[in-house]
Every structure is written in C-alpha cells, then in structure tokens.
C-alpha cells in the first residue's frame, strides 16, 4: 500500500556555459512526507559521461513506514523502471536519458515504475545521473517525479 505521495518538479538547464542550480524543499510537518531536490551546477552541453550526477534528492518521513519509492509517470524510458527520458523544452527532439540510483535503491519490478528502498529510516537520499555516455544539446530539461513512503507491511 502506498501512502503520502509527494510530487516534485524541477528544471535542469543545459547551455554552452551555464546550468542553473535549484533546491526545492516541500512540506515541513513531522508526519508529512518531505522531499528535496538539488540540481548540480555547471552542467555543459556536449559530451556527458555515464554516471554524471545531475541532481541529488532526499525523502524524509517520520511516521511509521517500511521504505520509500521515487518514480515518474510521464518520463519513463523503455522497460527499465529507474530510467527516465527527458525531452528538451526548447526543442522536444532534444533528449537526455537519466536514471535514479542510490545506495540500497532497487528498480521497482512489481509496479515497473521507479526505484524503491526498503528501510525504516526516516531519511533516504538518491541521485539522478546520466544513463550512458551521451551528446547533449543546449536546452532546458524538466525533471518531474513523485515520491512516497511505503506503508508498514502486515506480518
């Protein structure tokens, strides 16, 4: 059972010399899911290597839970649940393929969407990284994902 779904949307800018950095904190109350996404600075158009970190995310929930899930409904690429295909805002033919990853995170093979982390810890972090070596044109990229805390499983 899923609970406390929170949606996070941010923009990744790729231009010849500059990429904007942003931080997007959402929610504050003790029993509410909190999500934060920080986009890295100075991402250049051109060659980007596999594994390059584009953003770092955090999910926090202080209530009873058995883990976290992060996914995107709109940007899923292919059959790998953790891989997303971002389209450029200036030119929708521009693409960059990214993946969600982090220590302990696994592809959610049950639903086929996103990454899941089984933990009772209140906090978890994940990264958005480049998936494969790519040549990326200058454009603006929107990263749109959802996060939730997983309900305690009945034993």
Outline where the language-model segments fall.
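Bacterial N-terminal signal peptides that target proteins for export
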Residues: 2-14
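Generic alpha-helix detector with strongest preference for long hydrophobic helices that associate
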Residues: 10, 38, 109, 119-122, ...
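Compositionally biased, intrinsically disordered low-complexity regions enriched in proline and serine
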Residues: 14, 43, 62, 95-96, ...
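N-terminal signal peptide c-region/cleavage motif recognized by signal peptidases
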Residues: 20, 24-25
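N-terminal small/polar-rich segments of proteins
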Residues: 26-90, 123-136, 140-142, 146-155
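Mid-chain, structured segments of secreted extracytoplasmic proteins
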Residues: 73-119
